[in-house]
Each structure stands twice: as C-alpha cells, then as structure tokens.
Swiss-Prot record:
Binds 1 zinc ion. It comes from Brucella canis (strain ATCC 23365 / NCTC 10854 / RM-666). Its EC number is 3.1.-.-. InterPro entries: MetalPrtase_cat_dom_sf_prd (IPR023091), YbeY (IPR002036), YbeY_CS (IPR020549). NCBIfam families: rRNA maturation RNase YbeY (TIGR00043). GO terms for biological process: rRNA processing. The gene is ybeY. Belongs to the endoribonuclease YbeY family. It is an enzyme of class 3 (hydrolase). Single strand-specific metallo-endoribonuclease involved in late-stage 70S ribosome quality control and in maturation of the 3' terminus of the 16S rRNA. This is Endoribonuclease YbeY. GO terms for molecular function: metalloendopeptidase activity; RNA endonuclease activity; zinc ion binding.
Length: 168
C-alpha cells in the first residue's frame, strides 16, 4: 500500500480487546496486504473497524441479516463495489466480536492474532465486493484470503489438519 492512504478509524465499543495501538497495527498490516494483493490503484480511502462483543454483534446480525445470534465479523459496505474493481473513497465498516473470535481461535488451535487478521481480511474483501454465497464465490474469496494471509506469514485458515480428518 506504498502510495495509498487508507484512513482507518478504530473504535473499541465493548469487549476485552488489546489496546487500540495494537489493534490499529494489526488492522493496518492486514488491510495493506489485501490492498497490495488485489493490485488496487493508489487511492485515499476511509475504513472503520469496530471491535465489540457478542451481545452487540448479535443485535446487528439480527437487524441486518435476520439471524438472532452472534457472529465473528460483519461488513457494511458504504457503496456497492464489484469484486476486482477500484473502490471509492468510502469503503465502509467492519464489526468484529471478541468472544466469538476468541472461542473460534481456541477451537481451531490458532493464535487469536492470526484469526483476527483473517477476519479483518475477510471483512475487507466483503467491502470490496467479494462474497461466499455460492461455492464458486467462496472458492475465489478463500483463495484471495489464503494469498493475503500468506503474505502476512499466517497459515492457511481453511487447511484441514490430519487431526480433523481422523475425528470425522
């Protein structure tokens, strides 16, 4: 993201999150890796990332997606963007829930920082028009996530371990 200026607003709304500077560093690195991977042109853009808890994200998930349960990440694009096209100056909002992120990282045996980076990348790709409603869309989006996370030295979040195979 060498010539880009993405202004990232970090808001800790609720939950037991690390300090804002640590979160800002993680988000900035994740977003820069995604921007570079996508080969987007230089731009000045704005992004908001809200760090909250399960109760707050459950309300949003119910209101916007009709699902009355917490989730790990929600994305709210400022404007519709077609995957692969240049975004406008306002990207949108990403909301992440602490308890769900923590639980998933523990269940999947991965560092919470790696899982959090993955969710930032996942949410950012949604803001840029990527989705996973169909198998084809999911393949494209997950391939992008793998490439971006690899650039951050984070292992493939979708890899199936031998232990997973043996427990089925």
């Amino acid at each position: 993201m060498s010539d880009n200026a993405i202004h990232i607003d970090i808001m800790i709304e609720a939950g037991n999150w690390p300090d804002e500077a640590s979160l800002e560093s993680l988000v900035s690195k994740s977003v820069a890796a995604a921007w570079n991977n996508l080969g987007l042109k230089s731009a000045t853009s704005e992004l908001s990332v809200v760090f909250t808890d399960d109760a707050s994200i459950q309300l949003l998930n119910g209101e916007w997606r009709g699902k009355d349960k917490p989730t790990n990440v929600l994305s709210f694009p400022a404007f519709p963007v077609k995957a692969g096209s240049q975004p406008g100056p306002m990207l949108g909002d990403i909301v992440i829930a602490r308890e769900t992120v923590e639980r998933e990282a523990k269940e999947e045996g991965k560092p919470i920082e790696n899982h959090l980076s993955h969710l930032v990348v996942h949410g950012f790709l949604h803001l840029l028009g990527y989705d996973h409603e169909t198998d084809e869309e999911a393949e494209v989006m997950e391939a992008r996530e793998r490439e971006i996370l690899h650039a951050l030295a984070i292992p493939d979040p979708y890899a199936v371990s031998d232990e997973d195979i043996n427990n089925d």
